[in-house]
Amino acid sequence: MAFKDDYLKINSQTDNYFLKTKKIITKFGDKDVTYAVFLRRPGILAIKMAIDWIKFVAKKRKIKITINSPYKEGDWFGAGEPILYIRGSMKNLVDLETLYLQKIGPSCIAAANAFQMCVDLPMSSFIAMEARHCAGTEMSNMMSYAASVGSKSAKKKKAKGFIGTSVSEPSKYFNLNSGLGTMPHALVGYAGSTIESVRMFHATFPKENIVILPDYFGKEISDSISVCREYNHLAVKSMVLVRLDTPSGRYIEGLDLAKSYNIIEKYAPQSISEYRSEEELKHLVGPGVSAAALWYLKLSDNLCTDCQSRLLLRFHYLFHEFFRIEQSIWD
């Protein structure tokens, strides 16, 4: 249990000047104090893990600690505004600051970033796939928790938000019992072809949606259409999806820079004509997973004459979008 582990390691994981302060207070006398905790940048309140840990420590030490917040979980707060008040014995609180701050800052900033992702793409559903990029399971749980908080706030603005996480333990934050996911590239390589990997997946999980991972052999269009043709009876039920994860070193099958510009100018001309940074331009028309690539794949699949129904494409942005949230925590 993470709470127990952190409790046992308070002395070894706390900033040393807090430990020295505790010795001084022990020598010269304790006082009742109130800590006002704040962040130096705006964020969304996601402090449940910190509060639960402080309560756990209070129970272990058999002391009384009063905890209050002027905000509710999911509320926005400003830079420098107190988001948490902790009152109690200074001797028993002073050595906790390092560890509870570790549970407050990252969660609040990640929740804000998750919120922004969801409202920027309100019609898209997201899966939190940060686990493989985190520094341990505690951070992974923290990021999933933060994604759930930011997502709930975004849903109040009619965004679809996060629908789950890729691992089972933190799936409780999304009211699920297990993680979500389909297949890694390794399975496509193991199967020897995209279509064979789908056959294996469907034979093992016949009741689940088929999610095509078509970039392994560089045939995003051809392989997607091949799967749709073979599983058209599922495509008409919206049970065939495409996960686009093309690396940034190349364009998807049949696409290039000129075609990318043509697509964006046709379907979203204002995004090209108005001001945008070079980084934003790369996401619009660059190689890999771009806005143009999504449109191109969608248009190509919908032109498949062998499919009797329009293929439903759902891009859950599984291409490490959440990892960028983790990076921005430390900005």
Feature roles, as predicted:
Residues 1-94, 98-107, 111:
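Flexible, solvent-exposed loop/hinge segments and secondary-structure transition points
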Residues 41, 75-77, 84-307, 311-326:
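Buried, small/hydrophobic-residue-enriched core segments of structured protein domains
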Residues 328-331:
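C-terminal structural cap/anchor segments
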